[in-house]
Amino acid sequence: MTKKLYKIAVLPGDGIGPEIIQEAYKIIDVLQKKFSFNVKMHEYDIGGISIDKHGTALTQETIEGCENSDAILFGSVGGSKWDHLPEIEKPEKAGLLKLRKHFNLFANIRPCKLSQHLLDISPLKNSIIKKGIDLICIRELTGGIYFGKSNKITNIDDPYAFDTEIYFRSEIKRIAKIAFQIAQSRKKKIVSIDKANVLKSSILWRDTVNKMAYKFPNVKLEHMYIDNATMELIKNPSSFDVILCSNLFGDIISDECAAIIGSIGLLPSASLNKSGFGLYEPAGGSAPNIAGKTIANPIAQILSLSMLLKYSLHLPFLSSCIDEAVHEALVKKYMTMDISKNPQNFLKTNEIGDKISDLLAKKA
């Protein structure tokens, strides 16, 4: 193992964030002791806790700390405590979204995997998921309807509101390229999601993706309307490999993936820019209703660390070791409350972190 020193900015945030980050620290500790992983970590405030301590959800200190790091390991932000704030000052928008914008993190990568040994976790029938699920959702993260012109007019007899979806070809092109590159290392199959029978932005999306496909002749491309895709994902999830989506459609599809495998607590995610710098976080939110109860599922946080090692630090072996340890833990039925079939028999947050750490240590 190389002795190169890696730097990770750790942003625990709010809610369950600090709890599940602690379990990721256990994994890093094993990597340091057993695999000679040389890393320096530094924690920074973000979100609600940053508002409470510094008056803003994202401080210059946090931004600079992230700039001086190789990657960001992120917990979660938000909670009812800050709901009274104006929209632009809330932890999510003023913290996480601002951070994504600052680093131009345009590509969201969210794996969705459920092995044949764990079919009982999924709410779907075994006959539907008997082959297991192994897909990855690639979502454009900085364009589309969430960033287009919008307004709400209420001081008239018939109030109205509007949102505008805008996509530049360059935005579509760069996310499509990442999807095709990832597909090349998998089953060489992409399903691109759009609504090209209705939306002009989707027509441009489809045309751009088609043009990108010419550069990757060994990858099979299929287009699917969003309404049909949501249905097919339930009917035959094992037929999907790489799913390419706009911001809005990716928001929908990626959460459907969480439902299919049984818990959003199992889904990690990566948000990358063109240089490979990334922010890695669980797909779920801050879950303030369970914060402090030691029942949060830390697996998504641990798998987010695995993605960080793979995509930003380019250490695929260490990433694979973590993935295998998590898989073994689930096969052994080490489960948190959200995925346990027996509500009286489950492991606490710290307990499953210990189990996964022990399994990882045995791989050294």
From Swiss-Prot:
Subcellular location as annotated: Cytoplasm
Pathway stated in the Swiss-Prot or TrEMBL entry: Amino-acid biosynthesis; L-leucine biosynthesis; L-leucine from 3-methyl-2-oxobutanoate: step 3/4
Organism: Buchnera aphidicola subsp. Thelaxes suberi
A Pfam family of this chain: Iso_dh
Signal peptide from the UniProt entry: none
Residues annotated to bind NAD(+): 79-92, 285-297
Name of the protein in question: 3-isopropylmalate dehydrogenase
Catalytic activity: (2R,3S)-3-isopropylmalate + NAD(+) = 4-methyl-2-oxopentanoate + CO2 + NADH
EC number(s) given by UniProt: 1.1.1.85
Domain of life, per lineage: Bacteria
Function per UniProt: Catalyzes the oxidation of 3-carboxy-2-hydroxy-4-methylpentanoate (3-isopropylmalate) to 3-carboxy-4-methyl-2-oxopentanoate. The product decarboxylates to 4-methyl-2 oxopentanoate.
Known partners and oligomeric status: Homodimer.
GO terms for biological process, alphabetical: L-leucine biosynthetic process
Top-rank EC class of the record's enzyme: oxidoreductase
Membership in a protein family: Belongs to the isocitrate and isopropylmalate dehydrogenases family. LeuB type 1 subfamily.
Co-factor note (free text): Binds 1 Mg(2+) or Mn(2+) ion per subunit.
InterPro entries in UniProt: IsoCit/isopropylmalate_DH_CS, IsoPropMal-DH-like_dom, Isopropylmalate_DH
Lineage of producing organism: Bacteria, Pseudomonadati, Pseudomonadota, Gammaproteobacteria, Enterobacterales
GO CC aspect terms: cytosol
